[in-house]
A protein has these predicted regions:
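Periplasmic peptidoglycan-binding/tethering modules of Gram-negative envelope proteins
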Residues: 1-132, 205-208
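Periplasmic OmpA-like peptidoglycan-binding domain that tethers envelope proteins to the cell wall
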Residues: 107-116, 136-208
Length: 208
């Protein structure tokens, strides 16, 4: 006999009084997730069998389940394991902010008026917990290569130390000095030299 008329005979039917699917031994599957309703903790929401028929939680709603999401409380992308990616606009903002950081002449001491800029930079870095940030120091061509190299390294390190104090983990940052080797303007003019004395901050996601 087949009491529920689902083409699964009663002796083989795990749900003999409820029409169901042959593939599920005659039991129904309301949400179509392949888990029989009787075994499904979420019978009206599709979910994997390994989670008892319930969908994996996704706190930030970015489409990456919390179990696979490296940033479960920040909206991110599937390609970046659920973490936000550094967009071009954010990259530009970091560079624009970093270039306005001021130091005492010939020293690595950050001027007090740069603290607001650094606080803004720290806020940006905090939004990208799986991104590695490289802090670069650059100088103009005035003075010896050795002095410029050391000064650029010390300035990059000063910025990194400040950001560490603001709560950015040290392992997410590196500081490197390039001295006068990477000018972006003409060192033969006062304006060009001022432009070349700068800090840059670059962020790279692990899969880049």
């Amino acid at each position: 006999p087949d009491s529920d008329g689902d083409t699964v005979i009663d002796k083989d039917d795990a749900c003999p009084n409820t029409p169901g699917l042959v593939a599920l031994a005659g039991c129904p599957d309301a949400d179509g997730d392949g888990v029989a309703d009787k075994d499904d903790d979420c019978p009206n929401e599709a979910g994997p069998a390994e989670n008892n028929g319930c969908p994996w939680p996704d706190r930030d709603g970015d489409g990456v389940p919390d179990k696979d999401d490296l940033c479960p409380d920040l909206v991110g992308t599937v390609a970046n394991n659920g973490c936000p990616e550094v967009t071009e606009s954010v990259r530009k903002a970091l560079l624009d902010y970093a270039k306005t950081i001021l130091f005492d002449t010939g020293k690595s001491t950050i001027k007090p008026q740069s603290e607001e800029v650094l606080a803004n930079i720290a806020d940006i870095l905090d939004d990208y917990p799986n991104v590695q940030f490289r802090i670069e120091g650059h100088t103009d061509s005035t003075g010896s290569a050795e002095i410029n190299q050391r000064l650029s390294q010390e300035r990059a390190q000063s910025v990194m130390n400040y950001l560490i104090e603001k709560g950015i983990p040290s392992e997410r940052m590196s500081a490197v000095g390039y001295g006068k080797d990477r000018p972006i303007a003409d060192n033969n003019t006062r304006e060009g030299r001022r432009t070349n004395r700068r800090v840059e901050i670059h962020g790279e996601t692990p899969n880049n």
